[in-house]
């Protein structure tokens, strides 16, 4: 049994603490990140696989950290993105346009790998039989596609027949294609940005110097850690280069968490993985919650041995349907009754929670009845580098 010391008096099993996910909440400076580090230290000491999604770079100096700084020494390989990933990446909500964008990606893959010609895959006057043969040949090819061709390929996806239904289309449905114009502007804007190109490892312009530092596919690291014991190491995915762009940060984290869940579900034999997402409220897409990677792990991850620890400043920052996926809470100081109403199990402890000292927390949930007040251990070597400026 894997046991985690939380305080001088209390040691709990990892199964009891984490198998129903753990939410760590508390006001800024109350000690929630330090508590998360104490738990991760207990897991690492016993060679349990742990990962952190770090929004600010605070955790990159932890001992034995394997640091993947996205946009610097790590990237998300655009060649491996699915149609569903592209829809998330470019913010497509309309189901019809989502389908067209996925089709456009498949078409460009056919053009690159089957037709082996530059440009787009034309669908005007192409027979359905020929298209089905091409699709049948299309498996996972290493040849990348040019995302810059997506706008032109999208137009081909609106080919419609006139009087010959053996072909995909004889003319372009221009009114249908016009619905894609906002998406096309978004694609052109994003794919022309250097930061976007570096993050997704897109081919750089000829006059652009290649990065001097070694770069690693972060999805490879995710698969590596998800399938093996970590040799007392911790994977830190540093998103700090995108801290100024919340929309891009949400997409990055959803792509990472979706890929991690997908990888865990495909592994026949894998190890338990604990994923800490610090300041999780930054990354939750409330309007697209069911497809958000964080929510999907909260709902589906346990069956695959994938367990969440989220830190956030207030339960009000998270949707109720996400809160409902957590069976356990580590609650540092909260100051308002409205916050406590989000977690009914805590309502009788409002005064206690409001007056807790830094580093004190209430451990509550299904396996901790009644809740326990604990003075969390401080592990000096796990001290994260806070970015809060100090007065002088």
Short names for language-model regions:
Residues 41-42, 57, 61-67, 78-296, ...:
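P-loop NTPase motor domains
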Residues 19, 232, 305, 358, ...:
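Active-site lining segments that contact anionic ligands and/or coordinate catalytic metals
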Residues 21-23, 49-51, 232-236, 272-274, ...:
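Residue-level preference for the first positions of well-ordered beta-strands
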Residues 1-76, 291-294, 320, 363:
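Glycine-rich phosphate-binding loop of nucleotide-binding enzymes
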Residues 10-14, 321, 327-392:
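P-loop NTPase motor core of the ASCE superfamily
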Residues 10-11, 22, 28-30, 241-351:
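Conserved P-loop NTPase motor cores
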């Amino acid at each position: 049994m894997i046991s985690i010391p939380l305080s001088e008096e209390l040691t709990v099993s990892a199964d009891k603490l984490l198998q129903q996910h753990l939410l760590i909440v508390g006001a800024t400076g109350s000690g929630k990140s330090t508590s998360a580090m104490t738990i991760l230290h207990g897991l690492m000491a016993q060679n349990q696989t742990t990962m952190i999604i770090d929004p600010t770079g605070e955790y990159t100096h932890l001992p034995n950290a394997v640091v993947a700084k996205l946009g610097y020494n790590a990237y998300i390989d655009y060649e491996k993105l699915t149609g569903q990933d592209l829809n998330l990446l470019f913010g497509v909500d309309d189901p019809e346009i989502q389908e067209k964008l996925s089709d456009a990606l498949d078409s460009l893959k056919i053009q690159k790998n089957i037709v082996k010609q530059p440009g787009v895959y034309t669908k005007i006057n192409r027979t359905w039989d020929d298209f089905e043969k091409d699709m049948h040949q299309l498996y996972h090819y290493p040849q990348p596609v040019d995302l810059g061709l997506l706008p032109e390929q999208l137009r081909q996806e609106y080919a419609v027949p006139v009087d010959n239904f053996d072909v995909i289309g004889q003319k372009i449905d221009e009114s249908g294609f016009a619905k894609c114009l906002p998406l096309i502007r978004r694609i052109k804007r994003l794919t022309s940005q250097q930061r976007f190109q570096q993050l997704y490892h897109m081919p750089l312009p000829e006059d652009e110097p290649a990065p001097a530092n070694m770069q690693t596919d972060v999805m490879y690291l995710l698969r590596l850690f998800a399938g093996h014991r970590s040799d007392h190491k911790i994977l830190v995915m540093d998103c700090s280069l995108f801290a100024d762009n919340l929309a891009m940060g949400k997409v990055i984290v959803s792509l990472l968490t979706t890929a991690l869940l997908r990888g865990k579900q495909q592994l026949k034999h894998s190890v338990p993985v604990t994923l800490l997402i610090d300041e999780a409220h930054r990354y939750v897409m409330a309007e697209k919650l069911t497809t958000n990677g964080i929510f999907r792990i909260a709902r589906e991850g346990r069956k695959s041995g994938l367990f969440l620890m989220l830190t956030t400043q207030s339960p009000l920052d998270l949707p109720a349907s996400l809160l409902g996926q957590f069976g356990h809470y580590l609650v540092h100081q909260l100051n308002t009754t409205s916050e406590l109403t989000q977690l009914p199990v805590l309502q009788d402890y409002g005064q206690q929670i409001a007056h807790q000292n830094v580093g004190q927390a209430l451990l509550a949930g299904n396996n901790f009845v009644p809740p326990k007040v604990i003075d969390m251990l401080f592990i000096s070597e796990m001290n994260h580098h806070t970015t809060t400026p100090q007065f002088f």
